[in-house]
Regions:
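A conserved regulatory-domain signal marking ACT and ACT-like small-molecule sensing domains
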Residues: 255-416
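Terminal amphipathic helices with adjacent charged low-complexity linkers/tails
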Residues: 58-66, 246-265, 311
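Acidic-aromatic/histidine active-site loop/patch
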Residues: 237
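Nucleotide/pyrophosphate-binding catalytic subdomain
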Residues: 1-234, 387-392, 404, 408, ...
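Short hydrophobic alpha-helical runs that function as membrane-insertion/retention elements
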Residues: 186-190, 244-246, 305-306, 376
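Short phosphate-binding/catalytic loops that engage adenosine nucleotides
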Residues: 52, 108, 242, 302, ...
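Structured, non-catalytic alpha/beta "coupling" segments that mediate domain-domain communication
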Residues: 100, 240-241, 245-246
Length: 416
């Protein structure tokens, strides 16, 4: 039996690299209707005809997951997490079954598998489970029978044998975990955008597509608002050296590679992109220690991002979706706390910042000139993140993108 462990990302080898195994993930817009599902089926059959052993991870059709969540809350104001997982996991299964039918009509063999049937084992946290093990025996058997394997993304089975879901973007994580377990050196992520851009093109029409970014940069981008990839999927890819190729579903464009930083990437432009999010809440807490606070938040599976401590006050941010869990923890600790939902976060990200001291000064000067005063600032070797009023987020993204010349071809921009 092939088994590959993932949590907490131990230093171990996955299966031997297999150039013949291709893992492809298709998002909800790629399988939004029967016509698109048939198009995906054709692409999978073509990939197999090219000599590949094909595994495809599919998301739910269009807005199916949102519709199912809405249905749950129409029945119950606070549905039990276990039952919610049982409900919303069906969307991906529908996509896989339909795709398998389409493949059969094209003259190829296919089998659809749920996350549990595919061997995706998770912890016991419903709604945001983490993959702890991949038991790929059934996938290997199907591939050996020349079948295209369709795996329902976003889901698995817990160590307690309950159906679990992996949280938003969880199909990315499913695909990368399978790529690592199957020894596939590349995982192709098909989406409704042409790759990773220097900013959200909806805010900055002149934003450019990046040919390649490092795992480190992509992790920061994903954690700071870029919705192209889920953070966890990039962590697994980096840990198991799986290259990611983000590609458009309905275009021949080359997309963006996410891979280990190499000498060519070290010569790249100073800044790779400007990201933003309005989906975080900023908390200020007094009356506890950092160790006690963050241990309690971790126990509740709250994903903490920004952390700043000044004297007795601890400031941190967490996803808006984690608001109930976070406030339950804070109330349980008996601390004094306040929360702000009227802030957004804008981040400037680039590997070239490691050896360039002037980025922060330039970013703050640009924001000041636009009349924007950051509420909280945090940094890493390749990121500067500013929490600012939500109403100023769009302006901040535009002026920072322009100031760092991100609308110019990479060869013409400032380099490290």
């Amino acid at each position: 039996m092939t088994t590959t462990q993932f949590e907490p990302l131990p230093d171990l080898a996955a299966a031997e690299p297999s150039t013949g195994t291709l893992v492809m993930k298709f998002g909800g817009t790629s399988v939004a209707d029967p016509e698109k599902i048939t198009g995906v089926a054709r692409r999978l059959v073509e990939a197999q005809a090219g000599g590949n052993r094909v595994v495809a991870v599919l998301s739910a059709m269009g807005h199916t997951t949102d519709d199912l969540v809405r249905l749950a809350y129409e029945v119950s104001p606070r549905p039990k997490p276990r039952e919610l997982d049982m409900l919303i996991s069906v969307g991906e299964r529908i996509s896989c079954a339909l795709a398998a039918m389409a493949i059969h009509d094209l003259g190829a063999e296919a089998i659809s598998l749920t996350g549990s049937q595919a061997g995706i084992v998770t912890d016991t946290v419903h709604g945001r489970a983490k993959i702890v093990d991949v038991r790929a025996r059934r996938i290997h058997e199907a591939l050996d029978q020349d079948r295209i394997v369709l795996v329902a993304g976003f889901q698995g089975v817990s160590t307690d044998f309950d159906i679990t879901t992996l949280g938003r973007g969880g199909s990315d994580t499913t695909a990368v975990a399978l790529a690592a377990a199957l020894g596939a050196g590349v995982c192709e992520i098909y989406t409704d955008v042409e790759g990773v851009f220097t900013a959200d093109p909806r805010l900055v029409p002149t934003a450019l597509k990046l040919h390649a970014v490092s795992y480190e940069e992509m992790l920061e981008m994903a954690a700071s608002g870029a919705k192209v990839l889920q953070v966890r999927s990039v962590e697994i890819a980096r840990s198991h050296d799986v290259k990611l190729h983000v590609r458009p579903s309905f275009s021949p464009a080359d997309g963006t590679w996410v891979r280990e930083e190499d000498d060519r990437m070290l010569e790249k432009a100073l800044i790779s992109g400007v990201t933003h999010t309005r989906e975080e809440t900023l908390y200020r807490v007094t009356g506890t220690t950092a160790s006690q606070l963050f241990a309690a938040l971790a126990g509740a599976s709250v994903n903490v991002d920004t952390i700043v401590q000044t004297g007795p006050e601890i400031v941190f941010s967490a996803p808006v979706d984690d608001r109930d869990a976070t406030t339950d923890v804070l109330d349980g600790l008996g601390v004094e706390w306040s929360a702000r939902d009227d802030l957004g976060k804008v981040s400037v990200i680039g590997a070239g910042m490691k050896s360039h001291p002037g980025v922060a000064a330039k970013a703050f000067a640009v924001l000041a000139e636009a009349g924007i005063e950051p509420e909280v600032v945090t940094t890493s070797p390749i990121k500067i993140a500013c929490h600012i009023p939500s109403d100023d987020v769009d302006t901040a993204v535009v002026v920072l993108h322009k100031a760092f010349e991100l609308d110019a071809p990479e060869a013409e921009r400032a380099h490290a």
